[in-house]
């Protein structure tokens, strides 16, 4: 009897792109972030990708003290793999962005694979009533912002986090980012299996047409062969459609309110767990199985939760 392919669902419950005024369902406080992570894990997310926010006004923070308020609880109450951001926010320095990953030494950390324009300002057209002053600045300032991820930055993250046994979710927003990863593979600084998160539909990166997805996959196949584990992240309204196309073609999937506030056109998702449930239905509808956290650890060759610092 043929063995069904296992599909890893990653869930990103809060992130640093969206702001509290955009959705009443966006987790802000440590309690809310913890609740969202646990609910997503219960629905089948094997990996939880985490950012933190200031509990008073929801602005992104990389203060390890805030992460400390929810990480131990999540680890104690579920077996999901914890993936911490090193992207933080495009408005932060690399040193700021790395504080949580250096301190907590997670099994997985995200790693953005190239500097890029990171255009959030079009959201001002949809969301005109903003509660906090920082929200408008956060969006408007992205018109003249380069999200800095130089070769030196990437090398430093690879070596400093890698020394703690942390492996990476390589976030590739464009074709060039795949070539950047190949450069570090050639230098021996990135080891297989490579967990490649292909990101589609963010202004400044590759588009969200199925042909863009196909081009990403062909390029990754040519560069990495069988040495990579592929995952799809579609931004905004592209989340479920692109993840569905990808899963049908052999990818894993990432969902969550970090990446999209929507559950269907014009309807806000009431939780990241609802998005996990929706993509799980697609996966199981294709006669595939979702990967458990233990299976995800084996697929990605992770060090295990016992070897983290939280």
From Swiss-Prot:
GO terms for molecular function: 3-keto-5-aminohexanoate cleavage activity; metal ion binding. The gene is kce_3. The keyword Methyltransferase does not apply. The keyword tRNA-binding does not apply. Belongs to the BKACE family. Its EC number is 2.3.1.319. Catalyzes the condensation of 3,5-dioxohexanoate and acetyl-CoA, forming acetoacetate and acetoacetyl-CoA. May be involved in fatty acid biosynthesis rescue via triacetic acid lactone. Zn(2+) binds at residues 49, 51, 258. InterPro entries: Aldolase_TIM, BKACE. Keywords: Acyltransferase, Metal-binding, Transferase, Zinc. This is 3,5-dioxohexanoate:acetyl-CoA acetone transferase. It is an enzyme of class 2 (transferase). Its cofactor is Zn(2+). It holds the Pfam family BKACE. It catalyses: 3,5-dioxohexanoate + acetyl-CoA = acetoacetyl-CoA + acetoacetate.
